[in-house]
UniProtKB/Swiss-Prot annotation:
The keyword Cell wall biogenesis/degradation does not apply. GO terms for cellular component: cytosolic large ribosomal subunit. It comes from the Bacteria. This is Large ribosomal subunit protein bL28. Pfam families: Ribosomal_L28 (PF00830). The initiator methionine may be removed. It comes from Rhodopseudomonas palustris (strain ATCC BAA-98 / CGA009). The gene is rpmB.
Amino acid sequence: MSRRCELTAKGAQVGHKVSHSNIKTKRRFLPNLVNVTFLSDTLGRAVRLRVSTNALKSVDHRGGLDAYLLKAREAELSPKAVELKRAIAKKMAGEPVAAAS
């Protein structure tokens, strides 16, 4: 399982740990990821995603998962999130949606 947010595509970054004597050693800055169950009002079901706490704050600010996904670019979403976005858009357009596995 990769350390990447499924909504914002935030991943691990590489930098230096700097000691008091200014010796630099490589280290990784990992994103703060949490497993969250969102409720989709449009689809009427729960969706489980692994997201960063920053994305969690953004989803809350936008007014829910549906609003966040519809506004987000597909390039920065995971394949699972893109599938959800398309299902939400299709449902809002009035077309029947097949159940996602």
